[in-house]
């Protein structure tokens, strides 16, 4: 494989992020369940950030035995990880909604879709902001 580009060259102005999605009816009726999910994710995420070598070894041993640990470590190092507190700050200061809007704009422009929902409308950080103290 040949590396064509390194996305870190565009950070922090742009980022490729993952996330969670829920239907509106599920979100409205299951806020406590979603808050528990957020708190559980935050605990696991913060553990991985603070103990990455141990966490990668555990992931490889317990879930990805067919994948060499060196490959898992390489994949881990290729991403930028943030603590749950860092995410809270970036949710609060609109960093994340701006990154999401960039992704939305890219996909909509390349799909030639003219009418789409802005990120500030479909992204609701309120549960996360309440769950992470």
Give the label of every model feature segment.
Residues 1-8:
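Ligand-binding "clamshell"
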Residues 6, 23, 83, 122-128:
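Helix N-cap / beta->alpha transition motif
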Residues 12, 27-28, 88, 114, ...:
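Generic, ordered loop/turn and secondary-structure boundary motif
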Residues 12-14, 77-80, 124-127:
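Short secondary-structure boundary/hinge segments and terminal tails
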Residues 12-13, 17, 101:
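Bilobed "Venus flytrap"/periplasmic-binding protein-like clamshell domains
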Residues 15-32:
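A bilobed periplasmic-binding-protein/Venus flytrap-type ligand-binding module shared by bacterial periplasmic
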Residues 28-112:
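Secondary-structure end/capping motifs
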Residues 100-133:
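Conserved C-terminal helix/tail region of periplasmic/extracytoplasmic solute-binding proteins
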